């Protein structure tokens, strides 16, 4: 067992990019993805805010998803870019705690928000006459507020524990951000009790919401199958397939990473999987929701036409 480090409290993030041409290529690719995510999510938020036809619970939830994704990727990538450009892979003890807190908060909030969006589609398709009551503005705000509060409390508990455990002399985190499970490998104490709480937390905030989402869309698909209108059936299938694509792309790598015991995990595999839910998903969400949505594309076309008409 290693000795405690009494002189330095900084961590070292080993990162994702090797110092080679391949590393430069991966860095450039991720930086471009980051820019696309910023532009896409900001555009989605502004579009929903500006177009009065999109002022509905469904699009309000979608704007919150874009807001979460915008902050989510901004919590991770700027530090990666700085480390690669300046060759400084260190992160302060406090900085690591802050990054971990925001990552966990945004990750859980997105999962809960996706569950709310699934419930919204379930009510809209299965109980259309009850929709204004079940998904009122007040209910919508409560779901969003609840998602943020629950995720913040959960994140605070995990981050405080991670910052309070004693760490060994080696402070090199084999990851590209301060991921709590990766930090636990550096601990100079037995963390099996905490690892059990991580498994429990992952089950509560990953497996249970995904089960709820699957049940909601199962009911939706059954209701859609019974529809007489071909146009309505096509629109409902399009909406559901869009949401299921987002959910699967987000939950699958996340659950596979956090629900597995440490003995079955590898740092390289964890880093690759983390790219999906921290970098790719925030970039893909606005693209998937806009390209498969006639209302969003129509609103985007109107905004572009207004901009060009003003310039003319």
From Swiss-Prot:
One of its GO terms (molecular function) is G protein-coupled receptor activity. GO terms for cellular component: plasma membrane. InterPro entries: GPCR_Rhodpsn (IPR000276), GPCR_Rhodpsn_7TM (IPR017452), Olfact_rcpt (IPR000725). The chain crosses the membrane at residues 25-48, 57-78, 100-119, 139-157, 195-218, 236-258, 272-291. Keywords: Cell membrane, Disulfide bond, G-protein coupled receptor, Glycoprotein, Membrane, Olfaction, Receptor, Sensory transduction, Transducer, Transmembrane, Transmembrane helix. GO terms for biological process: detection of chemical stimulus involved in sensory perception of smell. Odorant receptor. This is Olfactory receptor 2L2. The lineage of its organism: Eukaryota, Metazoa, Chordata, Craniata, Vertebrata.
């Amino acid at each position: 067992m290693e000795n405690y480090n009494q002189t330095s409290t900084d961590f070292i993030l080993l990162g994702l990019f090797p110092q080679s041409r391949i590393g430069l290529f991966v860095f450039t690719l991720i930086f471009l993805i980051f820019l696309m995510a910023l532009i896409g999510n900001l555009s989605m938020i502004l579009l929903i805010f500006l177009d009065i036809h999109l002022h509905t619970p469904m699009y309000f939830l979608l704007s919150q998803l874009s807001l979460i994704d915008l902050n989510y990727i901004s919590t991770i990538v700027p530090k990666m870019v700085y480390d690669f450009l300046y060759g400084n892979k260190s992160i302060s003890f406090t900085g690591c705690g802050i990054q971990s807190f925001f990552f966990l908060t945004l990750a859980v909030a997105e999962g809960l928000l996706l569950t709310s969006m699934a419930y919204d589609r379930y009510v809209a398709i299965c109980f259309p006459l009850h929709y204004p009551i079940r998904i009122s503005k007040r209910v919508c705000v409560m779901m969003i507020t609840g998602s943020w509060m629950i995720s913040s409390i959960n994140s605070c508990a995990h981050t405080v524990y991670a910052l309070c455990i004693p760490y060994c002399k080696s402070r090199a985190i084999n990851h590209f951000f301060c991921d709590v499970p990766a930090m636990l490998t550096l601990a100079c104490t037995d963390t099996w009790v905490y690892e059990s709480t991580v498994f429990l937390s992952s089950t509560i905030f990953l497996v249970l919401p995904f089960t709820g989402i699957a049940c909601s869309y199962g009911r939706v698909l059954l209701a859609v199958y019974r529809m007489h209108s071909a146009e309505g059936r096509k629109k409902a299938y399009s909406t559901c397939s869009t949401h299921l694509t987002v959910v699967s792309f987000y939950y699958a790598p996340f659950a596979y990473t956090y629900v597995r015991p440490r003995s079955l995990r590898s740092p390289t595999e964890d880093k690759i999987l983390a790219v999906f839910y921290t970098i790719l998903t925030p970039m893909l969400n606005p693209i998937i929701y806009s390209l498969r949505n006639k209302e969003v594309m129509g609103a985007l076309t109107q905004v572009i036409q207004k901009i060009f008409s003003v310039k003319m």
